[in-house]
Amino acid sequence: MMTVKCGLRHRAFGIAPIFVSILLASSGLVLPGGVAVAQKSDAPEKEFEDFDRTKFERSTTIDNEWFPLKVGTRWVHRGSTTERGKRVAHRLVTTVTDLTKVIDGVRTVVLWVEDYKEGKLDEAELAFFAQDKDGNVWSFGEYPEEYFNGRMIRAPAWIHGLNDSTAGIMMPGVPRLDTPSYSQGWAPSVFWTDRGKVDQMGQKTCVPLRCYDDVLIVAETSKAEPNAEQLKYYARGIGKVRVGWRGEGEKLQEVLELTEFSQLAPEALARARAAALKLEKSAYNVSKDVYGATTPSEHMPSAQHR
């Protein structure tokens, strides 16, 4: 489960700890105070989502209330994760740039992500998202560079339409509890098999920035990580505010909380754009078979929105 989809670990719930909600999930009950937990859906799960490029008429206007991607928005999440058997400090900085990139005929918004472990850059990433006319936010792939001791060691890129990779839904337009899980993308060449499922709604959680009511929790799983779930907490109009986990198979046990939420000034946005373009230049050199098959990103003011 990719780090960019960060949420934040549970610390405060409205009327009950998370384990109570988990125990009640199979019954489909609504707890006091309006807290709703998932129930088993009879609808079949799709291996892949039904992608139709004609449904992305205003693809770069990503205004899904749970997953808004407004140009210049920056989230900073802090917490910890497990690395080589010990807990280490973790900081994630996610920025919506003013770049777009056309992938398989759909213009996507480019996110620039920096992942720090113990104060050192562990990964830098470009991620690509678009919204369809039903409000679903789709992931069209990513280009991550992973580092060790300051040197890039690998870049497991995947892009929709290349190497049997397929775009997936990161956030439904209207999340509902009684729906099956959905593919968040399929990329067998880099073992990307993530799926999401609406787990709980109407929750309350508190992070260093503030407390949030009516929080949506999405549980994410992967074929590569059985018996492991990453829990992403979303607040309306903000996006991801917390990341937690559950399951005996969860190895990283990543915990993150939103500590900063801001809108960049023009100068800072220009610096983010330059950094993203520098990473893209590297991508064309490193990932010639995947990223090299894509068209260059464009500055949004000069790009035609689709």
PLM regions: where:
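Boundary at the C-terminal end of the N-terminal hydrophobic targeting segment
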Residues: 30-40
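Conserved functional acidic sites
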Residues: 39-306
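N-terminal secretory signal peptides that target proteins for export/translocation
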Residues: 1-15
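Bacterial N-terminal signal peptides
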Residues: 14-32
